[in-house]
């Protein structure tokens, strides 16, 4: 067997084993599989975003180099469709082939700063697929808390270690219109990917709750109202100013709020929501605390 095929198999079995041991928390802002998408990720972080989304016949571009051949073998074993091409070799044909697959309904994944860098600089040409087909682009960052980083590599390539805690963050979709400037859109993608990568690499693991919530792409805050509804509403408005991307759940228990008479109807919900500046939250009401939990919050507060 060719040495590159051997290396490809070794890499596949290592990644497959590691994947089976990871404890993964996904932060998916839009539902990544709800509609066809182009996934954008950094070259140095590619292992986790790709292997966590395997088995879906996603199209991914690999370079024409020896490393690209190894990568293509790994991707095929994970049920990806590997298209060979790079910025210097067979680029146009590879893009045309990728667009052809996209027209058939396949999802697409690009390492948008690959294959040679510079690091974390998006190549605008790769956005053509999203623009030509009219499908959304979703930035992705997935990081294992324990990983091996090749610091001398141009992309600071990361290899996740087995049994690691892992976070996968799927950002808000970016739409690239037919008349949009690709260079400007490349900067937008670059900015969003850097934010997600910074959060996944650093702030997700922070023990400082303010730091965590400030950098979370869409934190979920759960507030349990024990006594004063107006105080809870004021607190939500205060937190909304501090963490503008937050989504809130306000839980009102009729067991603990014996002094509050709240009929279970739409008018009460409307009355509460009208006092809030933003209506991006849930209001839960009832006797069962567990039954009324609709989200897994990042932060809980009792007032």
Please give the residue ranges for each predicted region:
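Active-site proximal beta-strand in glycosyltransferases
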Residues: 296-303
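Catalytic core of membrane glycerolipid acyltransferases/transacylases, capturing the structured
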Residues: 36-89, 133, 148-149
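Non-catalytic C-terminal accessory region of glycerolipid acyltransferases
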Residues: 1-13, 17, 54, 96-217
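An aromatic- and histidine-rich active-site surface loop
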Residues: 128, 284-296
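Membrane-interfacial amphipathic helices and adjacent loop/beta segments
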Residues: 5-26, 62-100, 258-267
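A short, well-structured juxtamembrane/interface segment
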Residues: 14-36, 43-48
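Short internal beta-strands
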Residues: 59-64, 248-254
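A short, glycine/small-residue-rich beta-strand->loop->alpha-helix junction that serves as a flexible
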Residues: 223-234
């Amino acid at each position: 067997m060719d040495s590159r095929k051997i290396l490809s198999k070794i890499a596949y079995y290592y990644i497959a084993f590691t994947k089976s041991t990871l404890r993964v928390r996904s932060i998916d802002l839009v539902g990544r599989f709800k509609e066809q998408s182009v996934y954008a990720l950094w070259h140095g972080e590619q292992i986790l975003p790709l292997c966590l989304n395997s088995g879906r016949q996603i199209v991914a571009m690999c370079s024409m180099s020896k490393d690209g051949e190894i990568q293509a073998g790994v991707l095929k074993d994970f049920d990806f469709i590997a298209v060979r091409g790079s910025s210097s070799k067979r680029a146009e044909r590879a893009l045309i082939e990728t667009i052809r697959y996209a027209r058939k309904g396949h999802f697409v994944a690009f390492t948008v700063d690959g294959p040679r860098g510079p690091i974390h600089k998006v190549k605008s040409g790769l956005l053509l697929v999203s623009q030509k087909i009219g499908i959304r682009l979703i930035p992705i960052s997935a990081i294992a808390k324990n990983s091996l980083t090749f610091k001398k590599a141009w992309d600071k390539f990361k290899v996740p270690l087995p049994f690691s805690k892992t976070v996968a963050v799927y950002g808000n979709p970016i739409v690239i219109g037919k008349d949009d400037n690709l260079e400007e859109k490349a900067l937008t993608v670059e900015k969003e990917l850097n934010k997600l990568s910074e959060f996944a690499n650093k702030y997700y693991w922070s023990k400082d709750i303010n730091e965590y919530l400030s950098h979370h792409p869409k934190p979920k805050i759960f507030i349990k109202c024990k006594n004063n509804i107006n105080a809870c509403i004021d607190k939500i408005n205060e937190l909304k100013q501090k963490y503008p991307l937050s989504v809130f759940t306000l839980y009102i228990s009729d067991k603990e709020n014996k002094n509050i008479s709240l009929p279970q109807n739409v008018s009460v919900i409307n009355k509460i929501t009208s006092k809030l500046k933003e209506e991006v939250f849930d209001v839960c009401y009832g006797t069962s605390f567990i039954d009324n939990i609709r989200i897994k919050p990042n932060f809980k507060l009792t007032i």
